[in-house]
Amino acid sequence: MLLHLHPDNPQPRLLKQIADCLKDGGIIIYPTDTIYGLGCDIHHQKAVERICKIKNVDPQKAQLSFICRDLSHLSDYTKSIDTPLYRMLKTYLPGPYTFILPASKQVPKILKNKKETIGLRIPDNIICQQILDTLDNPILSASLPGDMVEEYTDPEIIFEKFGDTVDLVIDGGTGGMNPSTVIDCTTDEWKIIRQGIAEWEA
């Protein structure tokens, strides 16, 4: 199903429909502040397994990421954040960044790789924020399978290609083509491990 959401003022009825789908273990394709992503409620193991199968990745080897609604929410899923790291995160979030951090016990086991790290995002996107508010759980954030092509910016074409694979495709307008910038914060020396759409300085 393709749902058309207003990018600046998402319809509450549709937000509830999306949250209900996620609570039931559904998989969605949704807009972010970068590219369209595959998502599910992180606490639904079968849904996470389904996304890993679509992506053809082993969750124990892959660096999986999920989105949170704010820094307070994010801090539940990582081990203690010291003051310098907190200040840096506060400077750059919400925004088009994924921060690799040590995973806390709150992170479902299936999402932890052998290093016990997790990628965390807070997208600067109203639809994302309001889905998270309605669901009240983080959402897995994975890129669409295959090569990133220009067609992946158009939700109508995304629906044609993936509509039979997922439960909902959310049309929030034209998406981007560049992914988030990924920063590894698991040591005292933070470093970029993937340069994406946004610049970053420690």
Where are these regions (language model features)?
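Active-site-adjacent structural elements in enzyme catalytic cores
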Residues: M1-A202
